[in-house]
Amino acid sequence: SKQTIKIQIKMKQNFKLFAALAASAAMMFSCQQAEDPTMDKAQEPIVKTRAYGDKTPKVTIYVETNDVNPLNAGDYMLSDGTAYADIVEFFAANLNKETVNGVVRPTLYLNDKMTNLLENGGAATYVAGLQAKGIKVVLTILPNWQNIDFTSLNDTQADQLATILAYAVNKYGLDGIGFDNEYGGTVTSVSGSYGNLITKLRAKLPAGKLITLFQYNTGGSSQINATAGAKLDYVYSDFAYYNTSISVAGVTKEHYAPMSINLGNYYSAYQISQYGSYAYDLTEAGYGAIMHFNLRRTSERNQLSLFNSIADGAWEETVTCENGNRPQDWTFVPSGYTITYAEATAQ
């Protein structure tokens, strides 16, 4: 029966997990230190890139660019030769504001660490470098304590912000925009603002670009009606093993991640095993995504056992790490960089 098969698979997952844990104890630092045996050309593995639509559930990895090089997210590879991550979110650019002739306009602010990941040719390294492995790169937008957020935009401001975000996607060769509605400060809600912004952004983006949303504490999702929610590609649950409660109207399970993991935490062997079991469950149930937040360098956390447990549960694959310990090797810009509506609409 299917239940018997499921039990057998879970037993196999646990066996593989404990074997992997024993192996990883001996190999903990191999990701950044060990050298592969020398191969001749005939023996060298072929690097493959999987078409984005071929794997489900998708894996999204958020990278805190304030202290981690996003290229580390592309170093984790499945046993079929393709990337473990399907989407990498650069976390985060900020929703700021300016006043023009007495009228408040939204702006997009790249902080000192984010600026040269995208500006001054940075996108050719940090965005295109991930895309070359078949990974979609999304820029997450986060309010910034300026008393403005995605729930407080009038129609004009929503249109201006959507224009700025679509411009940024084009300027930097990004694959989409992600929303996380936290840290807005004191705001006055405008009915339907969040959904209006999503609708306007979808209309301005080329076909195939992504819009994602992290439903942290639901974050204003009550403002998103079913029509707007259906325009989202992926919604990620608040941190959970397996949270099937979708708080955004119009979002189906194929576009939802019930599993969302903070990689900044330490996890026991039992917890790692549980994540593998839930990865199996959500795959069988037809959910569309798994989310990882706050990827760390391998010198800080050994995430390989966790990724292996999830990959085994979801696709019966294993994961290896090519490096994972890349430093912040770009120059910081103290003033950051601001994209205004004027720049986004300049001819």
Name the predicted role of every residue range.
Residues 31-347:
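Secreted glycan hydrolases and related glycan-binding modules that recognize and/or cleave
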